[in-house]
């Protein structure tokens, strides 16, 4: 038996990278999962591969910044699996600049994906969360539920050149603490995981060619210069950047029954940097 048998999870931004690793881990522990990606081909392929491995997974394609998406996402869990127990707000990307070079478009793009989208997903889930909790309490069978919001060490300490990203991630930490107070009565824990340097396609790039991703028609430069990576990694006490599996492990810890009395916290997953 898995630690999450019978649970149903939503994981946004989960076709690749940390999100994909989260889906794999939750499914391996018995959860049924609705995964999400902006790219239909990526989402469908990920879902097919996971189902082939024995997971119960469905895909919900769409942009988390679309105001209509959160309702579809929550409904996908209820229609496919009949319940909702875990919400992981993972979708995001970096679009970095110093303040004097940051346009309004760039600023709002970072707030939309890192703060507004999680807010809307959680708001869309609130009717189900509250009604289910009340019914379970009345029946004498309370059920713990979990929300994990993906943040960053940049949202805790700030980071030069990431004015919009850091603001969005700081905001999600504030929302986490507030919702922990609002939803505690419904037996829901709400926590954030603040990542440090995790190697994904968003942080890696070819030495001679900056990487880009297409976000709703915008070509966004991503990646960390390999020379900078080489300088950063020795400063991490564990001596290396994290992996998607490392990130998934931190999120998983906040989804299991052993963390039922932990709420309103920001867990840093940074390999010890900074201490």
Please describe what each predicted stretch is.
Residues 2-34:
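Canonical Rossmann dinucleotide-binding motif of NAD(H)/NADP(H)-dependent dehydrogenases/reductases
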Residues 127, 181-182, 260:
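Alpha-helical segment proximal to the catalytic Tyr-Lys
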């Amino acid at each position: 038996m898995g630690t999450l048998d019978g649970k149903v999870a939503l994981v946004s931004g989960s076709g690749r990278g940390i999100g994909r690793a989260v889906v794999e881990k939750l499914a391996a522990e018995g959860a049924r999962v609705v995964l999400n990606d902006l790219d239909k081909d990526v989402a469908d392929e990920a879902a097919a591969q996971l189902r082939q491995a024995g997971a119960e997974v469905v895909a919900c394609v769409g942009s988390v910044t679309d105001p209509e998406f959160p309702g579809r996402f929550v409904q996908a869990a209820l229609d496919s699996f009949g319940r909702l127990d875990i919400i992981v707000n993972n979708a995001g990307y970096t679009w970095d600049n110093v303040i004097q070079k940051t346009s309004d478009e760039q600023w709002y793009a970072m707030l939309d994906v890192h703060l507004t989208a999680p807010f809307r997903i959680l708001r869309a889930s609130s009717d189900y969360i509250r009604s289910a909790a009340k019914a379970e309490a009345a029946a004498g069978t309370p059920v713990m539920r979990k929300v994990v919001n993906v943040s960053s060490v940049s949202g805790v300490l700030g980071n030069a050149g990431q004015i919009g990203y850091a603001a969005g991630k700081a905001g999600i930490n504030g929302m986490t603490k507030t919702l922990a107070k609002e939803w505690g009565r419904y037996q829901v824990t709400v926590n954030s995981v603040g990542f440090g340097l995790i190697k994904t396609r968003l942080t890696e790039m070819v030495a001679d060619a900056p990487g880009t991703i297409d976000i709703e028609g915008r070509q966004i430069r991503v990646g960390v210069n390999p020379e900078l990576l080489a300088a950063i990694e020795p400063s991490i006490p564990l001596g290396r950047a994290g992996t998607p599996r490392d990130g998934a492990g931190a999120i998983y810890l906040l989804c299991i029954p052993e963390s039922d009395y932990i709420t309103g916290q920001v867990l840093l997953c940074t390999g010890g940097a900074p201490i």
